[in-house]
């Protein structure tokens, strides 16, 4: 019994130490996460009946989030003295995130770790998204395409002068191209991704779902 209590105490101390170490504003770089909207719909959104997945939206890569990162690992759910965003502030992100529901969760998990206020975090995320040119070639995808994830990386690199291959990574899930993740300095310039972030899609080929 005593050993059990000591183990619980040690775990509590470790969690407290972790929370204390994840201070708001203490990070090395950002990951700008861009979701292929149709893939998110196929994996999650359709089952929810999310309006983001309605036909005719024409959404391609939408903003998933702007995530503070360490060179190894990442902070999350940090303590901050900043207030949470209002409903109006989260709703205002719908144009770049595909819908309003995601914005508040992104603030809670990642935004609080940025050291910024909620309005400034959303402004920074929006600016990061604005600075990246989305490859226009994918806007016309009208049927499922099977291709290597590296083809999409190549398109981003061609559309964004200065973006190098070690500054972008693709993810996939259930055989679908899921996200493009681009690594940025705190000033939103391109930079090399940490080793734990470079996790390219391991599939030889994956499916790019058609634009809805």
Regions found by a protein language model. Name each.
Residues 1-3:
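Positively charged n-region of N-terminal signal peptides that target proteins for export
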Residues 5-12:
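Bacterial N-terminal signal peptides
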Residues 6, 19, 37, 112, ...:
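Residue-level marker of positions within ordered structural domains that often coincide
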Residues 14-16:
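N-terminal signal peptide c-region/cleavage motif recognized by signal peptidases
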Residues 20-43:
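N-terminal module-boundary/linker segments of secreted carbohydrate-active enzymes
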Residues 31, 45-212:
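Domain-level detector of nuclease and nuclease-like folds
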